[in-house]
Each structure stands twice: as C-alpha cells, then as structure tokens.
C-alpha cells in the first residue's frame, strides 16, 4: 500500500452521500493519487477497495461506496485519458490550459468528462451536480463554477445537451 502523498486534499463533506456519490469522490481521490504519486490503476483500485471504501482510516470513517462504479470511473479515465484531455482542453478558456489546473481539479474534470461520455444512462444534470459538489468539498473559491462551466460545455459537445436543458432532436 502506498502512503498518502503529503498535501493530498481531504474533502470537507457535511452531508451523507449515496453510494455512487461516494464512489465518485473516491475515484477523484484515487485519480489524484495516481497523478501525484505515480500509482498504477490496479494498485490504487486494490488499495481503495481493501483499505478505504467503507473502512476507518486514521480515525476517519470512509463512507460505503459502490465499488463497481468506483472501478469503472478510475479505469475508464485511465483508459480514455488521451481522448478526454483534449476535450477538456477545448472546454477550458484559452488562458487556462489543462496543465495549469491542479491535480485535484484535473481529476474532477476527467472523472466528470468520462462519466458524461461513457454513462449515457445517468442524466447530465446528475453528473454535473455531483462533480460540482465534489469540487465544493475541496475548494471555496471559483473552482466549483469552473467545474460547472466545463462539464456543461462538455455535455453539450458529448451529449448535445447541457445541464437542465433537453436533448436536441434532429428532424
């Protein structure tokens, strides 16, 4: 098991979340760990499933998560990262390249982008809202607004709809 990198973000969640929401949060943390510590996907998934999801860690009780949802997000982001990053880059403003974002924000955007692309069964508004909530757990400034704007732009490109908007129908 890898130790947690120093400076690793810890969320400030005040409300209880559903198992998929917890899986999303854990996936963002795992993607952060992979980015910062260079941990591999198999190793980080095994670590989270064995020692974190639903477990007590350093006196903090991790909430129970949907392990299949967690695995799908982490593995999906890793598998599709070369496709996701250019899409995210296009959704960012010109003065904010993806490389300028911190690791946590990149993890949130990659996970949200993957879910928009791969999980058509989940409503756009749910995905955007969940990842905005995750951003709010880590940030108090403008980052949640950035997550909302970027995922909304991506939803328009990927699904032909934005948060709260109905899908466009072709005649």
UniProtKB/Swiss-Prot annotation:
<comment type="function">
    <text>Involved in transcription antitermination. Required for transcription of ribosomal RNA (rRNA) genes. Binds specifically to the boxA antiterminator sequence of the ribosomal RNA (rrn) operons.</text>
</comment>
<dbReference type="InterPro" id="IPR035926">
    <property type="entry name" value="NusB-like_sf"/>
</dbReference>
<keyword id="KW-0889">Transcription antitermination</keyword>
<dbReference type="InterPro" id="IPR011605">
    <property type="entry name" value="NusB_fam"/>
</dbReference>
<dbReference type="InterPro" id="IPR006027">
    <property type="entry name" value="NusB_RsmB_TIM44"/>
</dbReference>
<keyword id="KW-0804">Transcription</keyword>
<comment type="similarity">
    <text>Belongs to the NusB family.</text>
</comment>
<dbReference type="Pfam" id="PF01029">
    <property type="entry name" value="NusB"/>
</dbReference>
<dbReference type="GO" id="GO:0003723">
    <property type="term" value="F:RNA binding"/>
</dbReference>
<keyword id="KW-0694">RNA-binding</keyword>
<dbReference type="GO" id="GO:0031564">
    <property type="term" value="P:transcription antitermination"/>
</dbReference>
<dbReference type="GO" id="GO:0005829">
    <property type="term" value="C:cytosol"/>
</dbReference>
<dbReference type="GO" id="GO:0006353">
    <property type="term" value="P:DNA-templated transcription termination"/>
</dbReference>
<protein>
    <recommendedName>
        <fullName>Transcription antitermination protein NusB</fullName>
    </recommendedName>
</protein>
<keyword id="KW-0805">Transcription regulation</keyword>
């Amino acid at each position: 098991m890898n130790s947690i990198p120093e400076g690793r973000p810890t969320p400030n969640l005040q409300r209880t979340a559903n198992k998929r929401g917890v899986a999303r949060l854990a996936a963002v943390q795992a993607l952060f760990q992979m980015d910062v510590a260079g941990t591999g996907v198999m190793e980080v998934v095994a670590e989270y499933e064995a020692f974190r999801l639903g477990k007590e860690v350093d006196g903090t009780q991790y909430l129970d998560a949907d392990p299949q949802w967690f695995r799908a997000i982490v593995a999906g982001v890793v598998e599709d990262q070369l496709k996701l990053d250019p899409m995210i880059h296009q959704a960012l403003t010109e003065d904010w390249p993806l490389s300028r974002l911190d690791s946590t924000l990149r993890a949130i955007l990659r996970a949200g982008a993957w879910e928009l692309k791969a999980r058509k069964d989940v409503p756009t508004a749910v995905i955007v809202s969940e990842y905005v909530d995750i951003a709010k757990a880590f940030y108090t400034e403008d980052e949640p607004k950035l997550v909302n704007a970027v995922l909304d732009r991506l939803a328009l490109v990927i699904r032909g709809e934005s948060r709260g908007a109905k899908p466009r129908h072709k005649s």
